[in-house]
Amino acid sequence: MVSGSVRKHGLAVAGICVLLLAGTACSDTKADGGGGQSTPGASTSQSNTPGASSTPDASSTPSESAAASIAVVPAKGATSVQPDKPVTVTTTAGKLTAITLKDDDGDKVTGSFNTDKTQWTSQPQLKPGASYTVSGSAEGTDGATVPISSTFKTLKASKSLKASVVPLNGETVGVALPIQIFWNNPVKDRAAVEKRLSVKTSVPVDGSWHWVNSKQVNYRPKNYWPAGTKVTVNIDTQGVNAGNNTWGTSGRTIAFSIGKSVVSNVNVKTHTMTVRINGKLARTIPITAGKDGFTTRSGVKVIMEKFTVKRMDAATVGLKPGDPEYYNIPDVKWAQRVTSSGEFIHGAPWSSGSQGSANVSHGCVGMSLKDAQWFFNQTLRGDPVIVTGTTRHMEPGNGWTDWNTTWAAYKAGSALS
């Protein structure tokens, strides 16, 4: 399944379209944030010139041709136009022949004509605090071309909305990686923002967005990503009103790939880790896990970071020098982070005598250097490690914990559920 959004927009034309006869004057109507501009073209009609003779053969039937009369919304010269409102250009006679909408940087805004080309409507995705120019032409039923030109400015946002994303563009990741979008400012109108987010996949995938808080929204599938899937995330938030005068100032697209399926299961009670690659058992590894007082958490963990060498200092988990449990090892090899609080899977040659038989670590899963290197070379950021055998469970947000939430509860975290 491809998640996305369909947007419907109403049309409000506040301007007055006036078809003027030749020789009359015209004036523009200006209104901040709205209104419409009416641009009459030249019109043709039969002359009643004084002194001209009238004969029975002279036709009294009025001409059916007319010059194009144009209305642009927002009005020419308008300021503080809301970026999430569409721009419309309408003619009451003839048809529009070409319309272009550009900002002051030269970036075009896409739009479309209706069936008979009497109206053009832009996508409602303008930049806040920008100047825009509408240009083009229309052709009246009289065959005459009428030029179109109008300018306006959008309102200035007091706060912008920009996104940073996990994973990286072009990255190949594991089958359990949740898409994570971090906003630079809080989102009040989550539904409006979520409508602008979409995920496209090369194979059908059932997935959902889930708001972690007002500054983070994640996406994961119902089940692990199928191996080899190509994924494109479109963050189409330019011009979106996130609430509290916070407006999307840009959008971005992220494309990434899912690698092979590497699913690992750690059984703390049996002191083993099994690794299955594309569904087949690849290796069973003797391990040691957390001892009493440092129990390894059970739950679905996801590899977040990988280090060929990593310093591990117990001060990061609250232990101080002088404590009998304190350690500071400068060169732990083949370390892979699975929690924010400091649990890793890594090589632990100092505990080789306990691997496969006892739990002696401070919470990490340790193994031989040979097995740790092999495991490191198989995995990607985003691969799942499922830990069982303890009564201590994963806390929400202590790492990439999306898979510890039921699918029903996860979907309920969508602002559009």
Predicted features and spans:
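Acidic, low-complexity Ser/Thr/Gly/Pro-rich repeat segments typical of extracellular/periplasmic
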Residues: 2-260, 287
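Short, surface-exposed secondary-structure junctions/capping segments
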Residues: 39, 43, 55, 297-310, ...
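Pocket-edge structural micro-motifs
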Residues: 74, 124, 221, 305, ...
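Conserved beta-strand and immediately adjacent loop positions that scaffold enzyme active sites
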Residues: 98, 135, 272, 334-335, ...
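Gly/Pro-biased beta-strand-loop elements
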Residues: 161, 245-353
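Exported/periplasmic cell-wall-interacting domains
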Residues: 175, 298, 315-417
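Structured segments of extracytoplasmic/periplasmic soluble domains
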Residues: 182, 186, 190, 276, ...
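Short, glycine/acidic-rich beta->alpha junctions
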Residues: 217, 258, 265-268, 366-371
